[in-house]
């Protein structure tokens, strides 16, 4: 096993240490397929991506079952990743005038033929909103060496009972704002309303607004 492969295996094992036995192995192979780029080759299809990695058919089925029915959640994995990166001490947060930026945005995975909880997300190429599974992503901005690396902090999916982006945005702002340190500032683009930033109690933020924006303090 090459040092790089061994290193990735150790990191994945640390991230999955608190996941129940059985589910942890299934997620290990899923994350390995994701890191290796096999999901790009399979266009997001789970079973072909796993099979392309050389897994036996029964291992592919167990890994797919871990994804769909296993006892796990995204946020504990995100927290584990954040702790690992910070403990290694190589990641450095960007600072501007003493403040550390924390970015917040919505990301859409476009699935026009998927049934179920599918919202809509604006796609610039189509110049309109298209059916998509929408996530809110919050990440601290920093670098490792000379390479910029966002340190993921929060991943939220729309509530199945209400897939609107507006509701998801407010949830993201509320949770991201509550987790900000005294020297951190939340950075959002024009898709986030100033009223929502204030209503959800974000203590410090930088927002992109329209050129003709007017405010009164």
Where are the regions a protein language model picked out?
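A generic secondary-structure signal
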Residues: 52, 87, 175-179
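Electropositive, glycine- and tryptophan-enriched low-complexity nucleic-acid-binding patches
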Residues: 59-65, 124-183
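An internal, acidic/charged active-site-proximal segment
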Residues: 156-217
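Short, conserved catalytic/metal-binding motifs centered on acidic residues
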Residues: 49, 98-112, 138, 183-194, ...
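Active-site-proximal, Lys/Arg-enriched surface segment
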Residues: 35-36, 68-146
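Gly/serine-rich nucleotide phosphate-binding loop at the start of the catalytic core
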Residues: 1-68, 73-74
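Generic hydrophobic, aliphatic-rich segments that mediate packing or membrane embedding
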Residues: 45, 59, 98-102, 134, ...
């Amino acid at each position: 096993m090459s040092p790089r492969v061994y290193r990735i295996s150790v990191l994945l094992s640390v991230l999955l240490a608190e996941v129940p036995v059985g589910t942890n192995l299934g997620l290990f192979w899923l994350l390995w397929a994701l890191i290796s780029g096999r999901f790009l080759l399979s266009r997001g299809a789970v079973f072909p991506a796993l099979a392309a990695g050389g897994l036996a058919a029964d291992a592919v089925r167990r890994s797919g079952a871990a994804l769909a029915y296993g006892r796990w959640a995204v946020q504990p994995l995100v927290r584990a990743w954040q702790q690992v990166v910070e403990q290694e001490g190589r990641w450095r947060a960007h600072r501007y005038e003493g403040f550390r930026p924390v970015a917040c945005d919505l990301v859409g995975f476009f699935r026009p033929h998927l049934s179920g909880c599918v919202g809509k997300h604006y796609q610039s190429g189509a110049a309109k909103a298209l059916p998509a599974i929408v996530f809110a992503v919050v990440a601290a901005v920093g670098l490792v060496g000379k390479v910029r690396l966002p340190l993921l902090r929060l991943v939220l999916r729309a509530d199945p009972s209400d897939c609107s982006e507006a509701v998801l945005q407010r949830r993201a702002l509320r949770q991201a704002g509550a987790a900000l340190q005294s020297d951190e500032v939340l950075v959002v683009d024009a898709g986030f309303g100033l009223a929502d930033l204030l209503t959800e109690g974000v203590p410090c933020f930088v927002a992109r607004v329209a050129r003709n924006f007017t405010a009164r303090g």
